[in-house]
Swiss-Prot record:
Its EC number is 3.4.24.16. This is Neurolysin, mitochondrial. One of its GO terms (biological process) is G protein-coupled receptor signaling pathway. Residues 1-37 form a transit peptide. It comes from Homo sapiens. Its cofactor is Zn(2+).
Length: 704
């Protein structure tokens, strides 16, 4: 997705918090588990391990639960008049840090381990810990003491971020129903545990899906030889095509055989159809029930309360307004595509059915790009070998944000293809964090693109700072003999986007783990990474990112100009598809009696103008529904309003590699993490309220 990884976020939001300046007030019986946990939280070090066996994962999961619960119990047993900031809130915040770090080692391997048994153990650990998270987040004794603390402590004597932590803790307690009767609390708790398990299973099913189709060479017509040569062959000399991105999208964009594309699209949008449809049928009503018990009309209303949009009515108005503005552009693009199809069917002797099918869309959008801008992505990718792109990307971010990156030798990683880098502030030499790059597909690996926050950059109990650690997990094509991994331009854009999330994780400098990295409002979290996508649409920036893999020659200037100009190609249909997904997400979380497949089909016809293929159920493959974006997928478009405003008003005006603007962005947008509201950060950066002008221009629309 960003695709946003919510591993750390989930732990942070579900476990009320924790930290350890209760040394003066807690007894010796609590100190032992805290000391045991403290070995994992050391200032300036990456303490993560990736060599745990399934048995160790299981054992350490239970140990973590016992150790963390002891701290919560100690806080919960404090006499109400004994409660202080140090022995209550600070204590909870301290143990939260240790919990997150240890949990990462237990639940992250499900997404990246090459060992199926390790992945299974990690998934079970995630389920077990998620249930524990819910138990701890619904401790009435803890909530009572936090409320008492707010009522009695001198808020003027604690730092603003600590006040925010206190206020958020009480807000989350109420959103967990801790102000409601015990019977209702227990009902909510039971449903939340079930919801958590369903979400984990939904995405596990997608990650573990190993479906492939078999085609003859003739059925792969117009696909480049280097792609076909990279495919695994069957005993009868046919080719295996998986549904992973490096296989699926080249076929859908370049294969001239409609039946091949139809079979691929059908298989892609029926992945996990049976099991994930059942999960959605259970998950969506549970979310609604919990929301209603908490006093909200719908689940969408519940989640939006914490976002910058605030209400379903604002989201609906935004999506409907944008859809109407894009309608003429979408109609024109569909007409152009239909004419292309009609001509090609005549030229190739195919039957012309007079409509754009779901399996036609990517193919003819690719042809549109080639015809209107003379852009051949297969030719162009020869200038984007992954080593050159990576070097250019890292240099860009270093120069722009005042950082230096150093690749670590003999690094402890989860797969030999993974690399690890240390990040330092260029001016001071201070170590800010580390990041892993996991770039190639493997069996059982997370099959989209995401940044995973692994270790929070925050203060430790002794006042020192834990360095942030993140992982960029994507699935670019594997290198083959005589040729490195070559990236399409849209993959270069994905690389920049996800690395923007990595920089958010690393550059945030907060006191509390709960506010570290990308722990901002869900409809703001994409702002920093989307803003940095603009660098792959700039001629000078593209020169830094490209070089022919054979002779090192640069991309011709006229081709670069055409590539940049092609940014607006198909923008109507691409944006309308995002609106479709956003509307489906909103609908499913406002009216749970709806059938997901039917709702998707309805919006595809009404908004996109391209019918969904009968028999498919795209929502069953829609990982965002179970990955932390429930009721919030609109955030991709919503946050782009802000990201485009920042780019055009500052970077475009003052120079996209202007280090002063880059440091302003680092200090005002990245560094605060979630310690400030997203809208406050935007106002600090823009010195005004944000507007839609730049966003509409980026979509080829008139900005009033």
């Amino acid at each position: 997705m960003i695709a946003r990884c919510l591993l750390a976020v989930r732990s942070l939001r579900r476990v009320g918090g924790s930290r350890i300046l209760l040394r003066m007030t807690l007894g010796r019986e609590v100190m032992s588990p805290l000391q045991a946990m403290s070995s994992y939280t050391v200032a300036g070090r990456n303490v993560l391990r990736w060599d745990l066996s399934p048995e160790q994962i299981k054992t350490r999961t239970e140990e973590l639960i016992v150790q963390t619960k002891q701290v919560y119990d100690a806080v919960g047993m404090l006499g109400i008049e004994e409660v202080t900031y140090e022995n209550c809130l600070q204590a909870l915040a301290d143990v939260e840090v240790k919990y997150i770090v240890e949990r990462t080692m237990l639940d992250f391997p499900q997404h990246v381990s090459s060992d199926k048994e390790v992945r299974a153990a990690s998934t079970e650990a995630d389920k077990r810990l998620s249930r524990f998270d819910i138990e701890m987040s619904m401790r009435g004794d803890i909530f009572e003491r936090i409320v008492h603390l707010q009522e009695t402590c001198d808020l003027g004597k604690i730092k603003p971020e600590a006040r925010r932590y206190l206020e958020k803790s009480i807000k989350m307690g109420k959103r967990n129903g801790l102000h409601l009767p015990e019977q209702v609390q227990n009902e909510i708790k039971s449903m939340k545990k079930r919801m958590s398990e369903l979400c984990i299973d939904f995405n596990k099913n997608l990650n573990e899906d190993d479906t492939f189709l078999v085609f003859s060479k003739a059925e792969l017509g117009a696909l480049p030889d280097d792609f076909i040569d990279s495919l695994e062959k069957t005993d009868d000399d046919k080719y295996k095509i998986t549904l992973k991105y490096p296989h699926y999208f080249p076929v859908m964009k370049k294969c001239c055989i409609p039946e091949t594309r139809r079979r691929m699209e059908m298989a892609f949008n029926t992945r996990c159809k049976e099991e994930n449809t059942i999960i959605l049928q259970q998950l969506l009503p549970l979310r609604t029930k919990v929301a209603k018990l908490l006093g909200y009309s719908t689940h969408a209303d519940f989640v939006l309360e914490m976002n910058t949009a605030k209400s379903t009515s604002r989201v609906t108005a935004f999506l409907d307004d944008l859809s109407q503005k894009l309608k003429p552009l979408g109609e024109a693009e569909r007409e152009f595509i239909l004419n292309l199809k009609k001509k090609e069917c005549k030229d190739r002797g195919f039957e012309y059915d007079g409509k754009i099918n779901a399996w036609d869309l990517y193919y003819y959008m690719t042809q549109t790009e080639e015809l209107k801008y003379s852009i051949d992505q297969e030719f162009l990718k020869e200038y984007f070998p992954i080593e050159v792109v990576t070097e250019g990307l890292l240099n860009t971010y270093q120069e722009l944000l005042g950082l230096s990156f150093e690749q670590m030798t003999d690094a402890h990683v989860w797969n030999k293809s993974v690399t690890l880098y240390t990040v330092k502030d260029k001016a001071t030499g201070e170590v800010l964090g580390q990041f892993y790059l996991d770039l190639y597909p493997r069996e059982g690996k997370y099959n989209h693109a995401a940044c995973f926050g692994l270790q929070p950059g925050c203060l430790l109990p002794d006042g020192s700072r834990m360095m942030a650690v993140a992982a960029l997990v994507v699935n670019f094509s594997q290198p083959v003999a005589g040729r490195p991994s070559l990236l399409r331009h849209d993959e270069v854009r994905t690389y920049f986007h996800e690395f923007g999330h990595v920089m958010h994780q690393i550059c945030a400098q907060t006191d509390f783990a709960r506010f570290s990295g990308t722990n901002v409002e869900t409809d703001f979290v994409e702002v920093p990474s989307q803003m940095l996508e603009n660098w792959v649409w700039d001629v000078d920036s593209l020169r830094r990112l490209s070089k022919h893999y054979k002779d090192g020659s640069p991309i011709a200037d006229d081709l670069l100009e055409k590539l940049v100009a092609s940014r607006l190609v198909n923008t109507g249909l691409l944006t309308l598809r995002q609106i479709v997904l956003s509307k489906v997400d909103q609908s499913l979380h406002t009216n749970t009696s709806l059938d997901a497949a039917s709702e998707y089909a309805k919006y595809c016809s009404e908004i996109l103008g391209v019918a969904a293929t009968p028999g498919t159920n795209m929502p069953a493959t829609f990982g965002h529904l179970a990955g932390g974006y429930d009721g919030q997928y609109y955030g991709y478009l919503w946050s782009e309003v802000f990201s485009m405003d920042m780019f055009y008003s500052c970077f475009k005006k003052e120079g996209i590699m202007n280090p002063e603007v880059g440091m302003k962005y680092r200090n005002l947008i990245l560094k605060p993490g979630g310690s400030l509201d997203g809208m406050d950060m935007l106002h600090n950066f823009l010195k005004r309220e944000p507007n839609q002008k730049a966003f509409l221009m980026s979509r080829g629309l008139h900005a009033p």
